[in-house]
């Protein structure tokens, strides 16, 4: 059975507000990703951490809470972020159908990354990791229950460090933009209009 966890408990430090609760086209931002995921996994197979149940102090805690709240029948879980509201049904279906135990959407880097010490990195050898991401639910839960991972920002890293499993990278479109700063709503509006025109 397929299940979904929506992460909607963030404090919005960089946005200076709880961005998941912002009203965008007459609807709270978090509802977009929630409704899209719901349309795929169905009633009873999705938990909105921060809405249906309280979230944790960190992303890691919120993911653990979400995993524990899902039905035991869920064997593959997709983790969706409220701050990426324009995820499509097709993208969620693609991840859930992928048999790999750790799957993630990626985009090629468009800017050249640099370490704080001034060391440059070849962007052609790197990806920008995005969400949603999908996992073997039992494996991810076991990794977190090991107690080795307290403050992770990405579950593919948990799977890699615990099982030595490299994620399956799936290149995707730019619609998985993450709302982070106040000015990002203008970019989101552009993506929203583009998706509306495609329908």
Regions found by a protein language model. Name each.
Residues 1-51:
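N-terminal glycine-rich phosphate-binding loop and ensuing alpha1 helix
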Residues 2-4, 77, 167:
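Conserved hydrophobic helix-helix packing surfaces used for dimerization/oligomerization
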Residues 6, 30, 66, 81, ...:
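Residue-level signal for inorganic ion chemistry
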Residues 8-11, 56, 182:
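Glycine-rich beta-strand-to-loop/alpha-helix junction loops that act as flexible
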Residues 11-14, 82-86, 133-134, 180:
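Glycine/serine-rich anion-binding loops at beta->alpha junctions
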Residues 53-123, 130-131:
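Conserved beta-loop-beta/alpha segment of the NTase-like Rossmann-fold superfamily
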